[in-house]
Amino acid sequence: MKYYWQLSVFYLFYFGSLGALIPYWGLYLHTLGFDANAIGELMAIILVTKMVAPNIWGWIADHTGKHILLVRFSSILTVVFFAGILIDQSYSWLVIILFLFSFFWNAALPQFEAITFNLLGKQPHQYGMIRMWGSVGFIITVALFGWLFQHISITLLPILLIGLFSCIWLTSLLIPEQATTNLSVSTESFYQIITRPTVIVLFISCFLMQLSHGPYYTFYSIYLEDNDYSRHMIGSLWALGVVAEIGVFLIMQQLFTRFATNNLFTLSLAITALRWLLIGYYIESLPIIIFAQLLNAASFGLYHAVAMQIIRQNFSDQHQGKAQALYGSVSFGAGGAIGSLISGYTWEIYGALVNYLWAAVICIIAVLISWKWMDKT
């Protein structure tokens, strides 16, 4: 398809930055001397802005049609504001910088997802082949940085991230603005679509799914390090999980052909509940932890691909920017932020096991909701 590599390389660097941020930011803050409460709060800031920023940018993009220009604008400001971390590392300064940086960083991806589906047109099944490169970027950085931080100080993480954020901006220049003209217009308003029962159930389930990821995204690396896993091994385990999700992206077209989307979505939630139980109870068993990481094929790969498919089925190009923004803000934003805060406040008091238990329970609730009320499609 046209623009395949231009789209793919953006995902490569965007999720490459995510592969540096999610596994190692908690360790970086831990090295600076912050306790679990502070780490949870600082991680939550990045997710809180995801509740607001994407919706603002999504509304602007859909009403102006300037999706790629907004991606470029938000990407360059991401670099500018994140560079402020080099000035000071106090808690109050980090709060300000993380808020400003993430307000723009979180704005770019939903609009780029809308651009991707716009360009795919009648070939949405090719999304997995493009999004796969984001997973490749995640693997490269998480594995490379895991090895790197065995030899250099993790306090250099911000400098490395600035380089990755700069690459995001550069790759956004590869897509011409005229390539992203809307293809279809809906006769229904955005409000009418989001009040459909299936859409409501989707967003509730996505919120719960990302809520359950709180202990994982915030403390998984610290949890592993506390149980004598090396940073190289920590990076390898993160990378393994993403390798598994790539496998799912490669076969999504066949899965959509053979199985109903609602069944695939519910299955991803159920497998995620099992994954949290395995991590909580068997952290000292490397074979079980390896198996648990392979389950990321379902807890992110399958889950995200099916969610994208349902959104594409329900929202026209006219509303894709707002739809992608709402998906990000409700799930990764609200769900992720609340999950991060809960795990931050309970980690030192109740320990890892309790955190992964409540995460599993949340997933089971999501299973019941999606199984009972999501349309059989």
What are these regions (language model features)?
Residues 99-133:
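Cytoplasmic helix-loop-helix junction between adjacent transmembrane helices
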Residues 29-30, 60-61, 132, 147-152, ...:
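Interfacial helix-cap and linker-helix signal at transmembrane-aqueous boundaries
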Residues 147-163, 344-363:
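A membrane-interface helix-boundary motif in multi-pass transporters
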Residues 1, 172-206:
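Juxtamembrane intracellular "pre-TM" segments in multi-pass secondary transporters
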Residues 12, 81-82, 91-109, 207, ...:
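Hydrophobic core of transmembrane alpha-helices in multi-pass small-molecule transporters
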Residues 1-47, 199-237:
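Helix-loop boundary and gating motifs at the non-cytosolic
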Residues 69-83, 263-278:
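Structural signature of the two symmetry-related core transmembrane helices
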Residues 52-66, 149-150, 248-261, 347:
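Helix-to-loop junctions at the C-terminal end of transmembrane segments
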